[in-house]
Amino acid sequence: MAKRGKSVVRTLEDLTLDSGYGGAADSFRSSSLSLCCSEAHISYAHGGHCWNLTDSMRSRHNSLDTVNTVLAEDGETLECSGHCAKLPELEDVPWSLGEVENALNKEEELRFGTVSADLLARLSALVCRALVRIAREAQRLSLRYGKCTKYEVQSAIKMILSWTISVNCIAASLSALSMYNMSTEDKFSRGKSERCGLVFSVGKFFRWMVDSRVAVRVHEHAAIYLTGCMESLFREVFTRVLNSSVVEKDNGIPKFTLESFEQALSNDSELYGLLLPYQHLTCGKNANGILSLPDSLSLHRNQQCSSKAGDAYSQSEQRTIEQSLLATRVGSIAELSDLVSRAMHYLQPLSIKNHSNGTPLPQKSSLVHWEPEALYTLCYFMHCPQMEWENPNVEPSKVTLQNERPFLVLPPLMEWIRVALAHAEHRRSFSVDSDDVRQAARLLLPGVDCEPRQLKTDDCFCVSRKLDAASTEAKFLQDLGFRMLNCGRTDLVNQAINLLGPGGINSMSEQGMTPLMYACVRGDEAMVQMLLDAGADINSEVPNTVQKFPSVFPETRQATPLTFAVLHQHIPVVQLLLDAGANVEGSLQDGMENYTETPLQLASAAGNFELVSLLLERGADPMIGTMYRNGISTAPHGDMNSYSLAAAHGHRNVFCKLLSQSEKGKADVLSLQEILAEGSDLEERNSLKMEATRTGKAKLKALREAMYHSSEHGYVDITLDIRSLGVPWTLHTWLESLRTCFLQHRRPLIQGLLKEFSSIEEEEYTEELITHGLPLMFQILRASKNEVISQQLAVIFTQCYGPYPIPKLTEIKRKQTSRLDPHFLNNKEMSDVTFLVEGKPFYAHKVLLFTASNRFKLLLANRPAAENTCIEISHVKYNVFQLVMQYLYCGGTDALHIRNTEVMDLLSASKFFQLEALQRHCEIICAKNINTETCVEIYNHAKFLEAPELSAYIEGYFLKNMAVLIELEPFKQLLYNTPVENCCPDVLHDLEKTLATRIRSIHLSSSKGSIV
């Protein structure tokens, strides 16, 4: 026992605890201390090394030997997860199983065959849980600034997904967003998903985020990020299962079953906990409780990829670092400090390598460190009292008042660090504080909760050790001044101003925010008034200079106090600021480009009718959009104006308010123009007219953008409101609106939309009409028995088919074969074969029939060598068979006289005897005889005979004359008869294929109609 005590004392003497994360970062290279508890190092599927929980790990040795210990008491609580709170189950998800299958097939290595519907449904249900987790974290992060941007989604991805998977998903999201920003040509005529290169619908995800109240304001980039992430996550999960040794292979092709799928996920430590139904996130271990490192943290893998010899670790160092990352319990704060030190020394370079939060990297001297309070908070959650019992100076307690958390719910240290770092990076802070650890505990442990982090002055307060004493003192005094103002006591304003430094009342915090901005965030009306009276700049802006203010949140750059008051919807404060002379457009100056959202844009996105009305009364312009900082924008006023934001979020009342205000302003301007024009000359009148024209074009473009977003997100009522103003349809907005109405079973709106199709210019026809439009319209025709809708769809199909003639059937030029003089036709003389047709003999010659077709050759083969072999033909009429023989003996169709009553039978006979040229000749005759009365009968016969060319011709006739045919009962029966497998044809499906081919030839080809 004494020997063990000396070991612990010696170990603790080697540990240092400072304001960072321990001093061992400088000396651990020389450390020979091994934290390994087991010699069992095995390779693991989707991680580095995993640690088996062997009996040796249950031993009560010193605390460093029990970092990963499974205590005996844990066996009683292994089933505790059954009592844990569960995630909410989603009734609707923003994807379909068809989209999931297409997303998987997007990668060639995943195209190995058809995935069963049950497997797709199970995969969808599991990944749905990851969506809920990410959305819940993004929802909490969005409370700070009252909106969900790509940064909130990105940080949520980092918190929920493992190191390796999050990097891949963020890369996919960034790629989708880059493609979207670059696809500015004809952007209102193409879907957001197409512009992003995604299979999943960005519009569905946006609508889902709004309906789920992820935030009162959702930026379209956030929806793109989440869509790209989830699509990538589906492929990531499927790839890992595909590469799992659990999946059996049949001739090299993976053979999936639900059992093998579940087993593969259970063995993957990066996916198992993520896809569990519980609210807390089980990380770093698989279903058997085996801990393992993810791919990106595997020292063996990274060392093999490292090109620098100096970066190599010895075997003992590798085991020490791995054990530090996988630690689940600690016995003291000193031990934890050392473990965090080792882990951070290894993780920090990887964090920089995969840095992707959108801000410039800090200098190496400003790497993220752990504040002492953060370490103490983490120690509280990781502390194991039993590990102190080995200390001879500590007597174990005789009475236990608390139950320990079982091992199965304790995350390894690397997961604590991952989540805490994600929170710190989201704040743009250079230090992890205690609240970051509490937020991590809320996520990683069952039954732990805490409030979301609020926007405070000390969020990013950090004093570098490289600052001299005077600078450090000034920084602390400034922080004290902000705290005094933040407490809400107006009597401390003057004293606080004296502490803020040279900037006085307009001094800025690390986040680039002034005391007035913080007061607006809190909605402290009295403090706002006091600060204004003290001389605070009412139009101060959050700076753009990242070098001086590295903790500025990107989405708040150039924000003013009015912006923050609107963000948090404090209407009395907004009223106060406007009365005091605040710029109603925020930081926007006349004639300047706007790189941040105006207060009216923010109010419109939130749907706050009262706030929108107030800003409009004060002269806010709803036409102003936002220019992206990369300079990409097709609109002179920027993108996503107030109209678009209200429409995108489905705030119909706000949208109507914006419209009514602009119409009122337009009337006032016109009356003023008329007054001025009374005494002006012609040149001045023309100038006013041109100005009005420019304004009208700008508004039309703004409303087109709003129409695009409302249709993408499924707010069809707003789309129709915009259409009623005279804004023209694009094919895309029309199709999206039609799809929404069909899904919502809104028959009157469907009828109205179908009637509007004729207003779409043919130049608008794109590939989307074929890939999305035709399947949708034929689905509506199949599902709806409404005569009005059927008639309208028939008119649309006829319009799409075009005025050009149906492609003609052409004769097949028969190759020159053996022929006999017609004199020998049915001539008994010299005949060597006799056919018995309807009981009558028909004489023929083998020399001719052997070369006529394979069918005749087969009939004549293996017959006795008798001179006049008799072959019975039972299903062909005598006169029809005579026409067939006449065709063969004459060598063509010129001498044939075919009656209309015989052509169908002759077509069947020519098909049976495999005489293609004669068959085509009969098909041409049938095509000439087609009319509204005979078309259905001929079509059914052609389908029965499997004559594709004639069937396609008749389908063209159907489409060209569908407006008339849809009224006829035989045609209705043909369309709506339920197809039986391998029996009746699916006519609607065939019509869709024929129409798609036609549209490609006359609308999408370069010749535009010459190919028919």
Curated annotation (Swiss-Prot):
The keyword Flavoprotein does not apply. The chain crosses the membrane at residues 160-180. Residues 831-897 form the BTB domain. It comes from Danio rerio. CDD domains: HFD_ABTB2-like. It comes from the Eukaryota. Pfam families: Ank, Ank_2, BTB. SMART domains: ANK, BTB. It is a single-pass membrane protein. InterPro entries: Ankyrin-BTB/POZ_domain (IPR052089), Ankyrin_rpt (IPR002110), Ankyrin_rpt-contain_sf (IPR036770), BTB/POZ_dom (IPR000210), Histone-fold (IPR009072), SKP1/BTB/POZ_sf (IPR011333). Keywords: ANK repeat, Membrane, Repeat, Transmembrane, Transmembrane helix. PROSITE patterns: ANK_REP_REGION (PS50297), ANK_REPEAT (PS50088), BTB (PS50097). One of its GO terms (cellular component) is membrane. ANK repeats lie at residues 511-540, 557-586, 595-624. One of its GO terms (molecular function) is protein heterodimerization activity. PANTHER family: ANKYRIN REPEAT AND BTB/POZ DOMAIN-CONTAINING, ANKYRIN REPEAT AND BTB_POZ DOMAIN-CONTAINING PROTEIN 3. It is found in: Membrane. This is Ankyrin repeat- and BTB/POZ domain-containing protein 3-B. Its main location: membrane.
